[in-house]
Amino acid sequence: MDTWHDALGGEKQQPYFQEILNAVRQERLSGQIIYPPEADVFNAFRLTAFDRVKVVILGQDPYHGVGQAHGLAFSVRQGVRIPPSLLNIYKELETDIEGFSIPAHGCLTAWAEQGILLLNTVLTVRAGQAHSHALLGWERFTDTVIRQLATHRKHLVFMLWGGYAQQKGRLIDSQNHLILTAPHPSPLSAYRGFFGCRHFSQANSYLSQHGIEPINWKL
C-alpha cells in the first residue's frame, strides 16, 4: 500500500463520505462561508504522500477565522497572524530544537513536504463557529486515515495533544509506532505540560533510531 488512493479509495466511495461532501457543498451553495476553501480541504493529503509520512500531528477542526485555514492542522497562510496555539508550538520548538528560531509566519507547508501529516480530525468548519461540522461524519474518515497509517506503515511518530487527540491513541499500535502525548498547546493548557514535552527532539531521536531521516523543524 503506497498511496492515499490505495489506503482511502474505497472509503471515498462509501455513502457516508459522499453525504459529507454533499452537506458541505449545500452549505456553500446556500451562501454559508465554510473554511478552508473547497480547493484546500484535502491539502494535507496532497502535500504529504502516504508512503512519505514520518510524523502525524493531530488537530481538531480548522481555524474558523477569515483567511486562516488552508487544510493543514495548526498552519495558516503566509501573511496571516500566527495563532496562539501555533505560537506556543514555536516556543516549545525554540527550547527543544537547537538553532530553531520563531519564524515571522505560521505556514507549515515545509513540514508537510518533509513527511509531517498535519491532520485535523474534522476537515471543515463554518466561519466563526468552532466545531460546527463536528457531527458531519468527518471523524469516521479521519479515523480510517489514522488506522490505515498505523496498520500499513511502520515507525511513525504520532503527536497527540490534548484529551481529544489522545482518544485516537486507541487506533494506533504502540509496538510499531511512537505515540507522544501532552496537553494541548493552546494558551489555556500549554503550561500544564505542553511546554517542556520535548516531542520534537523525541520524534527525531526515534526516527534516527529506525534509520529514517529526521525532520528539519526550522521554517
UniProtKB/Swiss-Prot annotation:
Name the domain of life this protein comes from: Bacteria
Sorted alphabetically, the Gene Ontology BP terms of this entry are: base-excision repair, AP site formation via deaminated base removal
Where are the active-site residues found?
D61
Catalyses which reaction(s): Hydrolyzes single-stranded DNA or mismatched double-stranded DNA and polynucleotides, releasing free uracil
**Molecular-function annotations in GO:** uracil DNA N-glycosylase activity
Keywords on record: Cytoplasm, DNA damage, DNA repair, Hydrolase
Subcellular localization, as worded in the UniProt entry: Cytoplasm
Keyword Aminoacyl-tRNA synthetase listed? The answer is no
Signal peptide interval: none
- Main EC class of this protein? hydrolase
GO CC, sorted alphabetically, is: cytoplasm
A single Pfam family, by name? UDG
Which Gene3D superfamilies does this chain map to?
A: Uracil-DNA glycosylase-like domain
Which family is this protein grouped under?
Belongs to the uracil-DNA glycosylase (UDG) superfamily. UNG family.
What the entry lists under PANTHER family is as follows: URACIL-DNA GLYCOSYLASE (PTHR11264:SF0)
Know the name of this protein? Uracil-DNA glycosylase
What organism, scientifically named, is this protein from?
Neisseria gonorrhoeae (strain ATCC 700825 / FA 1090)
**Where is the organism placed in the taxonomic lineage, from the top?**
Bacteria, Pseudomonadati, Pseudomonadota, Betaproteobacteria, Neisseriales
The gene name reads: ung
